[in-house]
Amino acid sequence: MSIFDVLTLIGGLCLFLFGMNVMGDALERRAGGSLKKILSKLTKNKMAGFLTGLGVTSVIQSSSATTVMVVGFVNSGVMTLRQSIGVIMGANIGTTVTAWILSLGGISSDNIVMQLLKPTSFTPVLALIGTVLLMFGKSSKKKDTGSVLLGFATLMFGMDTMSGAVAGLADIPAFQNLFLMFKNPILGVLVGAILTTIIQSSSASVGILQALSVTGQVSYGAAVPIIMGQNIGTCVTALLSSFGTNKNAKRAAVVHLSFNVIGTIVWLTLFSIISAVFKPMILDESATYLGIAVAHSLFNIACTIL
């Protein structure tokens, strides 16, 4: 791996994070007002709250943003602490949608229909439409829609750039040893939590893991604990937003953290026992884009059931 590959990797990462930020901000502006009304009205029971949290987070692609809104609603008295719990649970599952979208980048079939599903096939068109709307749109809604499309195209281009740049890492012994270390579940959880805390987005963190999977050195045994840690790291944003709020709003942020920490402890313990006793072969297999998306969803669903 040359210095140019490193620079390409850094550039791809920057484009990916920038695109996700632009898309997320534009989605919140485009639908934020309506979604806030939905959040405040459709949370009278746990199931309604759960479905609302899932739906809102699927739209704005950020469980952190949804949870921050929930903390604000609890602080203002619009939502009770009890109502917030269902929304937080739904938000945790809604955030997995991003990984499923990114997993389309791993399609390698020669089938024309499957090829059309690859983001590299349609993102140039989205970028063109987004540019036209952003430059020539008269209303703020059209401009925001343009920003959403451009943001999505940018993050997918960044993802593709990262995937191409990291391919050379597969032959570097130090990189191979690094992911062998991450097979230690505790270390994997810590790495996932720290990375997500730094970039403030579990979706982006999972996307980076998906890009690294192209090397073939990321096993499911290493990926699963990292995914668990990513769910803990994403709680930091809500905790920070709760500073200066009332007691119940702080409790809502703590509920979010507790929900993910307890879920991680329970499932990590089970995962470690299964790994040590049964040694399933799948844990040694190389993770894929789709496999990581599936693992991310299954873990969040399992935490919600718990």
Residue ranges and their predicted role:
Residues 1-46, 145-194, 212-215:
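Helix-loop-helix hairpins and the membrane-proximal interhelical loops
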Residues 1-7, 109-121, 175-180, 221, ...:
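Interfacial loop-to-helix junctions that mark the boundaries of transmembrane helices
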Residues 9-22, 53-57, 126-137, 150-162, ...:
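Hydrophobic core segments of alpha-helical transmembrane domains in multi-pass membrane transport
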Residues 42-69, 185-208:
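Hydrophobic alpha-helical transmembrane segments of multi-pass integral membrane proteins
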Residues 59-66, 85-101, 119-126, 155, ...:
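Membrane-embedded alpha-helical segments of transport systems
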Residues 69-84, 88, 99-121, 159, ...:
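Membrane-interfacial helix-loop connectors
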Residues 75, 129-144, 244-248:
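Membrane-water interface regions at transmembrane-helix termini and the short interhelical loops
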Residues 116-120, 149, 249-262, 281-306:
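Structural signal for the N-terminal portions of transmembrane helices
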